[in-house]
Amino acid sequence: MAHIIDGKAIAAKIRSEIASGVRELQGKGVTPGLAVVLVGDDQASRVYVSMKEKACNDAGIFSVEHKLAAETSEAELLALVELLNNDPKIHGILVQLPLPSQIDTDKVLEAISPFKDVDGFHPYNVGRLSVGKPVFQPCTPYGVMVMLREAGVELKGKEVVVVGRSNIVGKPVAMMCLAEHATVTLCHSRTRDLPDVVRRADVVIAAVGRPEMIKGDWIKEGAVVIDVGINRVGEKKLVGDVEFAGASQRASAITPVPGGVGPMTITMLLQNTLESAKRGMAE
């Protein structure tokens, strides 16, 4: 039976370190500040935003929320972003996605100062990540890497298979694994013989958004499985992208869903905000 990599416990440890870093900065007269912008009334987005607000409060990070109506124009949103870019009390800006259809998401993300882009989505930060010199790392992949480190998983020379090529998780986590000297295969919907590719992996990172798509018997004996997926099945059941029951019989270590990667995402957002405030002081 696999060792369960407990995301809640790892997140709690990192958050305690963040809170201590925040107190240290406050002793020097600086409180890290995060601005969260929510456009419209998407229920899931509202839940995420309130979770982020609570996490900030717990860590001692100053957080301000800007709630805009669903009919807000692109120009109005861009004007707010510009205001936040120039606000010295704000070290991180997060625009909650998805945005309403009248707003060009790329244009908004590119308007955020790369030095306040705590989500790590600005092309400048994507480029820095790709050459191994990141300023901000995207929160979920960053969380995955911290979990692997905390679980004592050495990536150097290992075969890592990433399933899913999104800009939010798949591509950045593949680049981060490369930076740790792993041999990385990035799979997607057009990959041939996916089960055979996954069976080669020492580490499987699943981020495809399809419930239990990766079957337990695809997992090599002793592999490490990081399941980024979170899918609702029926009314109440949450499952990952990996068939947990079967995979946990073969893997040496595995993340559960829920309680695995999920808690790490907001934790790394706090970490990025703290790092941004520290960087601001050094300048």
UniProtKB/Swiss-Prot annotation:
Presence of the UniProt keyword Metal-binding in the record: no
Species of the source: Pelobacter propionicus (strain DSM 2379 / NBRC 103807 / OttBd1)
EC id: 1.5.1.5, 3.5.4.9
Domain of life: Bacteria
GO molecular function: methenyltetrahydrofolate cyclohydrolase activity; methylenetetrahydrofolate dehydrogenase (NADP+) activity
Catalytic reaction(s) noted: (6R)-5,10-methylene-5,6,7,8-tetrahydrofolate + NADP(+) = (6R)-5,10-methenyltetrahydrofolate + NADPH; (6R)-5,10-methenyltetrahydrofolate + H2O = (6R)-10-formyltetrahydrofolate + H(+)
Membrane spanning residue stretches: none
Reported function: Catalyzes the oxidation of 5,10-methylenetetrahydrofolate to 5,10-methenyltetrahydrofolate and then the hydrolysis of 5,10-methenyltetrahydrofolate to 10-formyltetrahydrofolate.
Protein's pathway: One-carbon metabolism; tetrahydrofolate interconversion
Residue pairs linked by disulfide bridges in the UniProt entry: none
Entry similarity comment: Belongs to the tetrahydrofolate dehydrogenase/cyclohydrolase family.
Name of protein: Bifunctional protein FolD
A Pfam family: THF_DHG_CYH_C
Gene3D superfamilies per the UniProt record, alphabetical: Leucine Dehydrogenase, chain A, domain 1, NAD(P)-binding Rossmann-like Domain
GO cellular component: cytosol
InterPro entries: Aminoacid_DH-like_N_sf, NAD(P)-bd_dom_sf, THF_DH/CycHdrlase, THF_DH/CycHdrlase_cat_dom, THF_DH/CycHdrlase_CS, THF_DH/CycHdrlase_NAD-bd_dom
Residues binding NADP(+), per UniProt: G164, R165, S166, S189, I230
Subunit structure: Homodimer.
UniProt KW keywords: Amino-acid biosynthesis, Histidine biosynthesis, Hydrolase, Methionine biosynthesis, Multifunctional enzyme, NADP, One-carbon metabolism, Oxidoreductase, Purine biosynthesis
Biological processes annotated in GO: L-histidine biosynthetic process; methionine biosynthetic process; purine nucleotide biosynthetic process; tetrahydrofolate interconversion
PROSITE patterns xrefs: THF_DHG_CYH_1, THF_DHG_CYH_2
Zinc among keywords: no
